[in-house]
């Protein structure tokens, strides 16, 4: 079956959504060989993945993932990664700020692959538990408002793609679909995308898959999140409509900053800077990039009417130590891990 689909792709044809679903199932069942997996994703990358293909892959991934019952009022802040900018874990910092304001956050992530510090790495450095089971994650969401969903725990079938992904070394469709397959089945998200050419395809995909409000962001300085140092291209899916606009720090009440103040060399430095943001002692650029990304998340969650209002709420949460109090709450060993 996969040989037939590979041949079709090699001839320059695209896959239907159903065929893409079949292909991804072959990958996740262990039926596909490493060579077949590498060939498939390489062909798609060179030719350009279609919305049908992305949607088929995501549906297959969602059908095989372990899920948690998180309710309808949960949001995720994550990115495709691979921006190469060596910034601290901004989306993780934003998740803490957002959860301090009463919005439940199911933070989907992993360890570092190409970055200096993955979200799992920095949480461990901060002394925050990573729930060891879906049950523990659900409890963390209910008691603390934020749970980290460690991707390998929920996407065990993706282990078959690990070898080819590592050997290939370049970004493929697998980098795109991870954020679209949150185990909490979030309908509202902020997703950082490393290239604007993918943001519209991902928005179309999420519209097809039934998302309510998803904001895709790409900094023009290469960040896969809202930048404090440059304009950010935004593609917004809201209630079935897709719109595009450009976001600047100044347009939401912030001053433009410098990337140097938000860059780190290790997970230790990332954790230290994140904590400094929460207690208000970090450089202004680090505080503002956190408030900017948290503000977009508050807007996507429906907590704020506009991004500017969300940014103001987020910055206030940092300045009055609400976010720092949430960081301390997350550190407390109250969650009992499931088996």
From Swiss-Prot:
A GO MF term: anthranilate phosphoribosyltransferase activity
Database matches in SUPFAM superfamilies: Nucleoside phosphorylase/phosphoribosyltransferase catalytic domain (SSF52418), Nucleoside phosphorylase/phosphoribosyltransferase N-terminal domain (SSF47648)
Keywords: Amino-acid biosynthesis, Aromatic amino acid biosynthesis, Glycosyltransferase, Magnesium, Metal-binding, Transferase, Tryptophan biosynthesis
Binding site for Mg(2+) 1: 91, 225
Catalytic activity: N-(5-phospho-beta-D-ribosyl)anthranilate + diphosphate = 5-phospho-alpha-D-ribose 1-diphosphate + anthranilate
Gene Ontology biological-process annotations: L-tryptophan biosynthetic process
Aminoacyl-tRNA synthetase is among the record's keywords: no
GO CC annotations, alphabetized: cytosol
Cofactor(s) needed by this chain: Mg(2+)
EC number: 2.4.2.18
Pathway(s) where this gene product acts: Amino-acid biosynthesis; L-tryptophan biosynthesis; L-tryptophan from chorismate: step 2/5
Binding site for Mg(2+) 2: 224-225
Residues the record lists as binding anthranilate 1: 79, 110
One Pfam family cited in the UniProt record for this chain: Glycos_trans_3N
Residues that hold anthranilate 2 according to the record: 165
Note describing how the cofactor binds: Binds 2 magnesium ions per monomer.
NCBIfam families: trpD (TIGR01245)
Subunit structure: Homodimer.
Entry's family note: Belongs to the anthranilate phosphoribosyltransferase family.
Role, per record: Catalyzes the transfer of the phosphoribosyl group of 5-phosphorylribose-1-pyrophosphate (PRPP) to anthranilate to yield N-(5'-phosphoribosyl)-anthranilate (PRA).
PANTHER family: ANTHRANILATE PHOSPHORIBOSYLTRANSFERASE
UniProt name for this protein: Anthranilate phosphoribosyltransferase
The organism of origin for this protein: Geobacillus stearothermophilus
């Amino acid at each position: 079956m996969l040989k037939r689909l590979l041949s079709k792709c090699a001839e320059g044809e695209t896959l239907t959504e159903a065929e893409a679903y079949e292909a991804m199932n072959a990958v996740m069942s262990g039926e596909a060989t490493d060579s077949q997996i590498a060939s498939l994703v390489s062909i798609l990358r060179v030719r350009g993945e279609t919305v049908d293909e992305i949607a088929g892959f995501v549906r297959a991934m969602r059908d095989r993932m372990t899920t948690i019952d998180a309710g309808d009022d949960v949001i995720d802040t994550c990115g495709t990664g691979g921006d190469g900018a060596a910034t601290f874990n901004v989306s993780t910092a934003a998740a803490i700020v957002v959860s301090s304001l009463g919005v439940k956050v199911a933070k989907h992530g992993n360890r570092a692959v190409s970055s200096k510090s993955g979200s799992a790495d920095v949480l461990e450095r901060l002394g925050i538990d990573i729930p060891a089971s879906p049950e523990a994650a659900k409890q963390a969401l209910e008691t603390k408002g934020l749970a980290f969903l460690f991707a390998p725990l929920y996407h065990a079938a993706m282990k078959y793609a690990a070898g080819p992904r590592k050997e290939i070394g370049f970004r493929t469709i697998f980098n795109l679909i991870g954020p679209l397959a949150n185990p909490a089945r979030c309908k509202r998200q902020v997703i950082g995308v490393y290239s604007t050419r993918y943001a519209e395809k991902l928005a179309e995909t999420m519209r097809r898959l039934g998302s309510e409000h998803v904001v895709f962001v790409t900094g023009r300085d290469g960040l896969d999140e809202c930048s404090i140092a440059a304009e950010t291209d935004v593609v917004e899916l809201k209630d079935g409509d897709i719109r595009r606009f450009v976001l600047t720090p100044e347009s939401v009440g912030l001053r433009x900053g410098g990337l140097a103040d938000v860059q780190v060399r290790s997970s230790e430095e990332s954790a230290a800077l994140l904590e400094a943001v929460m207690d208000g002692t970090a450089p202004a650029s680090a505080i503002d990039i956190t408030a900017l990304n948290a503000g977009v998340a508050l807007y996507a969650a429906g907590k704020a009417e506009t991004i500017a209002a969300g940014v103001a709420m987020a910055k206030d949460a940092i300045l009055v130590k609400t976010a720092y109090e949430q960081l301390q709450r997350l550190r407390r060993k109250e969650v009992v891990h499931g088996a």
